[in-house]
């Protein structure tokens, strides 16, 4: 079985969000499962530099101008790059300029990605042809549409990582992207009078996956579907929408081997975690004290992530003697709020604005609780890292958070399945009640250790996801 992933980011070469983490790990896990897997990406500068052995395998004239298709390897995975310097050779973000304005030609830049994905199934590389073309998020959303227009030379899967981004462009661009106008209607890629790359993927794919089972259900409901609930309900009823959880790349996130930690540990040597906490308290300007629980946030500071709730609940957390370490950036109002809290409570609140991958490991290794109070969360990786590191996740019951964390209720403790703390309603009172439950468990050290060991024993490896995808592909062929 030959599978081609079509996407716009690849960790560690180019990352703006969780999509890159998925594509940095899933293909290698699929290869280990015996699936011949390759990845197609635009030839962005960081990717060109990272795939150093890439060679030209063909050249084509397209609606987007003259392009070359390159092929090389990165971390043992075959990588195709679309070499079109007039479209992709730009510094900084792959999506917008330095003033944060989306590039005016994004419609062409990402239509080309979908077109090449489709042409791969029709023999663009004469030596390798995919049976399954697996497209990710709106950037690759036109891939299934081009496949449909070509008579479906391969089966297509479209994965929704975040339904909030729809890839919307004016209708007149239909003349520029090589698709028939007959596709521009409600039963096609039209959405609110414009072209939606995301809707194209949802409508034309043979199967849609979301990045968790709960998110796959949620996106059939109006509050999560952004106007696409009708189509998604239909696909769900046809058995063409399902959820497969993302995994954790254990080569990168594993406290037993993590060289970014002051002290490495396993579920059997959890006492070694204490040194990481001490070092984190020092680094964040917190009072060194192993008797108080250290809560942490590693997140974009947005209301989607529920960080306004953390700010509102913070006085209650501090009153009970807890500490907070925060790493993140985003909404200026939230940034100012957390910086003000740090100034008002020195030794109890430590804030670092920005994002540093290495420091996020130190927080995960040193904190006791990781807060993920999202209003919606398609899958979420932060809580999975928390489970892996014995840093108990405190989450809202939504999306992938609901699928991965079991509340430390009396019943779950008795059944041996507790792995963190879960709250229902998206308000500060509900969050604060969960924080109080964390303090209650903290006051019982042997029980806390029991839940840590339970959390660290859970398997969210990419191997599990790779098996699920292979079963899906086999059903389609």
Swiss-Prot record:
Catalytic EC class: transferase
Keyword Protein biosynthesis: no
InterPro entries per the UniProt record, alphabetical: Glyco_trans_1, GS/SS, Starch_synth_cat_dom
A GO molecular-function annotation: alpha-1,4-glucan glucosyltransferase (UDP-glucose donor) activity
UniProt keyword list: Glycogen biosynthesis, Glycosyltransferase, Transferase
Signal peptide bounds: none
Pathway listed: Glycan biosynthesis; glycogen biosynthesis
Amino-acid positions noted as binding ADP-alpha-D-glucose in the UniProt annotation, renumbered to this chain: 15
Example GO BP: glycogen biosynthetic process
Catalysed transformations (reactions): [(1->4)-alpha-D-glucosyl](n) + ADP-alpha-D-glucose = [(1->4)-alpha-D-glucosyl](n+1) + ADP + H(+)
GO CC annotation terms, alphabetical: cytosol
Domain of life according to the entry: Bacteria
EC numbers on record: 2.4.1.21
Entry function: Synthesizes alpha-1,4-glucan chains using ADP-glucose.
Family, per entry: Belongs to the glycosyltransferase 1 family. Bacterial/plant glycogen synthase subfamily.
Protein name in the entry: Glycogen synthase
């Amino acid at each position: 079985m030959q599978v081609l992933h079509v996407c716009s980011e690849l960790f560690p070469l180019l990352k703006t969000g969780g999509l890159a983490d998925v594509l940095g790990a899933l293909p290698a896990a699929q290869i280990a499962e015996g699936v011949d897997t390759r990845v197609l990406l635009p030839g962005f500068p960081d990717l060109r530099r990272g795939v150093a052995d890439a060679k030209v395998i063909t050249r084509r004239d397209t609606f987007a101008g003259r392009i070359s298709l390159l092929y090389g390897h990165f971390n043992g995975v075959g990588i195709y790059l679309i070499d079109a310097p007039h479209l992709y050779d730009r510094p900084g973000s792959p999506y917008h300029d330095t003033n944060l304005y989306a590039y005016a030609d994004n419609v062409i830049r990402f239509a080309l990605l979908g077109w090449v994905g489709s042409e791969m199934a029709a023999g663009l590389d004469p030596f390798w042809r995919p049976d399954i073309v697996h497209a990710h998020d709106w950037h690759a959303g036109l891939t299934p549409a081009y496949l449909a227009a070509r008579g479906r030379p391969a089966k297509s899967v479209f994965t929704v990582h975040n339904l909030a981004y729809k890839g919307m462009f004016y209708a007149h661009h239909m003349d520029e992207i090589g698709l028939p106008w007959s596709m521009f209607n409600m039963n096609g890629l039209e959405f609110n009078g414009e072209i939606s790359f995301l809707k194209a993927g949802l409508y034309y794919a043979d199967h849609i996956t979301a990045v968790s089972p709960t998110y796959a259900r949620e996106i059939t409901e109006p509050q999560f579907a952004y106007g696409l609930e009708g189509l998604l309900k239909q696909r769900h009823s046809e058995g063409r929408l399902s959820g497969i959880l993302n995994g954790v790349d254990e080569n990168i996130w594993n406290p037993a081997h993590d060289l970014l930690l002051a002290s490495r540990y396993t579920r059997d040597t959890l006492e070694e975690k204490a040194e990481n906490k001490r070092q984190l308290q020092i680094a964040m300007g917190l009072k060194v004290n192993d008797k108080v629980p250290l809560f942490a946030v590693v997140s974009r500071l947005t209301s989607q992530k529920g960080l306004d709730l953390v700010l509102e609940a913070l006085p209650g957390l501090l009153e009970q003697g807890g500490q907070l370490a925060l790493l993140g950036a985003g909404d200026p109002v939230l940034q100012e709020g957390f910086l003000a809290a740090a100034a008002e409570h020195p030794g109890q609140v430590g804030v670092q604005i920005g994002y540093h991958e290495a420091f996020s490991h130190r927080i995960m290794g040193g904190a006791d609780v990781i807060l993920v109070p999202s209003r919606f969360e398609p899958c979420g990786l932060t809580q999975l890292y928390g489970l892996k590191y014995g840093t108990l996740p405190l989450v809202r019951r939504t999306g992938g958070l609901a699928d991965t964390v079991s509340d430390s209720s009396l019943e779950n403790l008795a059944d041996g399945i507790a792995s963190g703390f879960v709250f229902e309603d998206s308000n500060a009172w509900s969050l604060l009640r969960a924080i109080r439950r964390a303090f209650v468990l903290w006051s019982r050290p042997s029980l806390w250790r029991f839940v840590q060991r339970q959390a660290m024993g859970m398997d969210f490896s990419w191997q599990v996801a790779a098996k699920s995808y292979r079963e899906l592909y086999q059903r389609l062929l």
